[in-house]
Each structure stands twice: as C-alpha cells, then as structure tokens.
Amino acid sequence: LDTGCQSEAGIVMDLDSGAVLFAQNIHVQEYPASITKLLTALVVVENTSMDEQVTFSHDAVYNVESGSGNKLQLEEGDVLSVKDCLYVMLLQSSNQAANALAEHVGGSREAFADMMNEKAASLGCRESHFVNPSGLNDPEQLTSAYDMAQIGAAVFGNPTLLEICSTTSATLPPTINNPNGRTYSMEHKLVVTGDSSDENYYPSAVAGKTGYTSLAGQTLVTYAEQDGRRQVAVTLKSTQRTHYSDTKTILDFGFARFKNVSVAENETDYVTGEEPVTIGDETYSPSDLYLDEKAVVTLPNDAQFSDADKY
C-alpha cells in the first residue's frame, strides 16, 4: 500500500503486540545519525545511577565531527549529573554529553560501543552496528528501521527515559560557559508543537528523538498514543525534509487501519478444566496454563479474532 512515505525507510510498530503495521525497506541498512542516542541512553540507565557526577573530558568535548555543534557550550571540566547529561543529550542532541556519558559508563567510547552492540543484539537487532554513542558520521555506524523500532520500544518502555524523551523544555545547571544555568527546548517538532494550525501539529505524539547528518539525511523516531493504543514510528534517510510529514502519515495509517484485541477475552481453545492439556508434543496440567490478561493481538479493523492464525 502506497502511503506516500518519501523517506527511504519507514516502519510503524504496535508496542503492545509487537506487530509491524507499516513497512518500507525496514531491513535495509541506513545511517542512524542522532537517533543513536536512544540506545546510548538505554545503556546508560541500565548501567549507572542518575545522580552520579559526570566530568566532561577534553576528548568528550572536542573529539567530535567539525561543524557538529555545541549548542549549550559545554566545556572541558564541566560536571553534570547523569540525569542532566541525559536531558541534554536527548533534548538538545548534545554529542558532547553522549561522549561524556559513554566515557563515564564504559571507560572509553570504544568499550561503550561494545556495550551498545550487546544491548542491541539482546533486543533482537540483527542489522545494526554501532561504533560511537552520538551517531556522528562513520561508515560502520549502521542500523535499520526495524532495529530502531525495537530500540525505541525498549526506550519508551522505560519510565525514566519516557519521561525525559517527552519533556519539552529543561534547565541546564550552572556550567563554565553558563554560570547562571540555561533553559533549553526539545527539538522534536511533533512533540513540542501545540499550535493546531502548524503543519507539525500531531497531538498523539508523546516522545521521540531527531537525527541528521550529511550521510544519514533526516532520521526520526516517534512514540505516539491514541485511544489506548501505543505505536512507535521510525523514518530513515529523509533527504527532502519529509520526516515529520512521513511520520504523521504512517502513524495515522497504523491508528486508523488496525485495532488491538485482548487474547484472554477471546481465546477459547486453551480454556482448561480438570484434565491435562496437550499442546504439540507437550502435556500440561491445568495449573500450568494461563493467558496473560494484558496480551493483545493487532488486527485489521475488518478482521475478527477468529480469523487470526494461532500458529
């Protein structure tokens, strides 16, 4: 089905069932750019505490791609908490904060990249390889829309990271170049736009992360909620700046065309009484079997639960 998505790759995944609702080149390797920082954040929160203090080294601040920016003027010798570094990295896409966090948690950026790859593999990512925590250009830094959806699902399923990624503005504590602190805003336009007349207005958008490099083009990961349903959308290699409009289009497609149906409320084949139950080659006692009350299956709107293939 042609939705008009102009990005090279795009995906919409239902976060409650894991079903892929829209797919366009989802297993093609592309450059991720700064959406890499979602995985960086996930590794950080799983391996350190939020109140630990991070000291910015010379390498963290200055060993970045020329022209990649330093919007908050972070400097060698600055000290921020892990929490503040995460906010700066995820809202302002600070490469310096990504580097500092990687050095703090992994000991070096190279060791941290190994941790990133291990975490990605544990999430089922098979088409990704990470060599730095920021997403700056590197021919070996690759991912796919499918893998980034898996990473996004893990990030937005983490309450700490969901809170950060849905925050529209935050305050930087005093630093060397900002002695009075500084307020800054999130860059993801679908999340921050409150004007219904704006082309980037999308009230279902809750959280997300932007990305751009010369190799990657525009990349975008977006988490959205609507009528009790949760979706993550990824667009990669948008070269015509259609990443926001593409994301709105494919999220709308997922919300409009599909529904979630409770498995526990509809499954009857495995309702047990007192007798043992055989499934395949295995026999179970009734007490061994139960249906997860939260489990859902995502179906097209015109389909019934009985239409679903149980195998």
Which residues does each PLM region occupy?
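Active-site-adjacent loops and short helices of periplasmic peptidoglycan-processing enzymes
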Residues: L1-Y146, Q150-P159, I164
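Domain-terminus/edge residues, biased toward the C-terminal soluble/receptor-binding domains
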Residues: C125-R126, E140-L142, Y146-D147, G152-Y311
